[in-house]
Amino acid sequence: MGHLKYLIFYLLCGVLASLCHVFSSAYFGHNPYIPSLGASGAISGVLAAYMIQHPTRKVHVWILFGITSLPAFLVVGLWFVFQIINGYGALGGNQAGGVAYAAHIGGFIFGLILVKMFVTKRVVLPEERKSFW
C-alpha cells in the first residue's frame, strides 16, 4: 500500500468510524454531544484490511492457558462478531462502558470497502503459499 496511501487509508477509516459513532448516538437516542476521541475506529479499518490481505496468515492468541496460532480471518472475524454483539447489548442501556462500538463496526466496514481502492496488488507471503509436498 505504501506510506502515503496507508496514512490516507488510516485517517479515512478513523473519520468515517467517528461519523458512524456520532450518527448512531443520535439515531439511538444517546447524547450525541458526548465527546469521543480515539483511534479504535481507524485501527478497526486496519484490522479489516489485514484480514482481506492476509486471511490465512497465522496470528498468535492467548486461549485459556496457552498461546496458539490461528488464521487471521478467524481471529479478526470473531473480534468483529464480538463488536456487533457488544454494540447491540450497549443499545439497551445508557452506557456502553466508554466503548464506541459503532465506531469499531463502522471503521471495520469502511476498511473492508476502502482496502479494495487502496491496494493495487496483493502480496502473497511465502508462508501463505500452498505447497504440493
Named regions from a protein language model:
Residues 1-133:
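A detector for small-residue-rich transmembrane helices and their helix-helix packing motifs
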